């Protein structure tokens, strides 16, 4: 018997969406359609990442904190509160730690479970949240085997590839 895929209500950028899609039924949420989608599809859990844009750019500027927009994450908070009332687990993944911890920590504080890509940020979440969430843990980036399959070795010209970001003089 084939195992049923989990249904994930998702607020994420494209990279994460594509990574999860082969293993889950994805329900992309926007600030405009989340009410009817959550009522109709009853997901297994809500997964929100530290997205800069989200599905079709609908979350741009609505998850990260900005000084000139103090209430920009109100819609996200409403979604999390709805999910908690309906007993839907809520998960936040900050893939921008440690550099953007402050930018996403307010939104992260709404959730039951918080994941970070930086083990050193766990204590920061624990002290910030005063143990309001159920757990804080590490969730590293991964490769989706469906998209990144090993291929037979062929003779290649080797070069250099850099995957990362430039943060100037922050350290």
Protein language model annotation of sequence segments:
Residues 1-41, 50-61, 66-72, 113, ...:
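Nucleotide-sugar donor-binding catalytic core of glycosyltransferases
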Residues 18, 68-69, 73-77, 87-100:
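Conserved nucleotide-sugar donor-binding subdomain of glycosyltransferases
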